[in-house]
């Protein structure tokens, strides 16, 4: 593990994230919600932005691209869906493509559902995944453009990652996600422990990410929609994972 990663707040509840390669001084931003906090974080570290790795086209993930590209002349990497309204793109990528940030290698996973163009970036050597608005800590993104089965398939791709991978997501939603998850699995010991940890972190005004994929596999009801205990929690014993996931997402939308 050689990369340096910095996490900070953008907008209201978006996360800004930088991943830096000490060997080459290359630095990538994962999305660009707004330019100001990203520039401030770069200045604090003495880093120069070389890349922006875009996950999807929503405005709260691309709003800072134009200013950052003008200032740093950085490369913009984005999903291959050219219909998505992302400007200033230098490289378009899809499933299985490798993106280099200096000597760091990021593998692209197509994770549609929240949007049709959504991708995640997996840095296997660093044991880290940047999943943006597909997988949150103890939650997942709203299914806006895709379908519930599509989103479920995307979550399964992420669930296949090893337990010791760190998850970075796009928003600080963990407290509300925990509150909802406890309505489904009030007796899940891992979830209750996570709830206590989240309450402590938020009381100290600290972020609840990164988290570990192994912890998500124990406590995230959306990631475990094919677990009989989760199905029972929404009165859908014997239903498919995709169907249980759809019910979970509908309930969360209304919560």
Curated annotation (Swiss-Prot):
Give the enzyme's EC designation. Answer: 3.1.2.6
Task: Keywords in alphabetical order, please.
Answer: Hydrolase, Metal-binding, Zinc
- Do the record's keywords include Plastid? no
Q: Which reaction does it catalyse?
A: an S-(2-hydroxyacyl)glutathione + H2O = a 2-hydroxy carboxylate + glutathione + H(+)
Molecular function (GO) terms for this protein are: hydroxyacylglutathione hydrolase activity; metal ion binding
Q: Under which pathway is this protein filed?
A: Secondary metabolite metabolism; methylglyoxal degradation; (R)-lactate from methylglyoxal: step 2/2
Cofactors required: Zn(2+)
Please give the Pfam families that the UniProt record associates with this protein: HAGH_C, Lactamase_B
Enumerate the residues binding Zn(2+) 1: 56, 58, 114, 133
Q: How is the cofactor bound?
A: Binds 2 Zn(2+) ions per subunit.
GO BP annotations, alphabetical order: methylglyoxal catabolic process to D-lactate via S-lactoyl-glutathione
Gene3D superfamilies linked to this entry: Ribonuclease Z/Hydroxyacylglutathione hydrolase-like
Binding-site list for Zn(2+) 2:
60-61, 133, 171
Bilayer-crossing residues are none
Q: Which InterPro entries match?
A: Clx_II_MBL, Glyoxalase_II_hydrolase, HAGH_C, Hydroxyacylglutathione_Hdrlase, Metallo-B-lactamas, RibonucZ/Hydroxyglut_hydro
Q: Which SUPFAM superfamilies match?
A: Metallo-hydrolase/oxidoreductase
Its top-level enzyme class, in one word, is hydrolase
User: What is this protein's function per UniProt?
Assistant: Thiolesterase that catalyzes the hydrolysis of S-D-lactoyl-glutathione to form glutathione and D-lactic acid.
Subunit architecture: Monomer.
Similarity comment: family membership: Belongs to the metallo-beta-lactamase superfamily. Glyoxalase II family.
Which PANTHER family does the record match to this protein? HYDROXYACYLGLUTATHIONE HYDROLASE, HYDROXYACYLGLUTATHIONE HYDROLASE GLOB
The protein's name is: Hydroxyacylglutathione hydrolase
Give the originating organism.
Answer: Nitrobacter hamburgensis (strain DSM 10229 / NCIMB 13809 / X14)
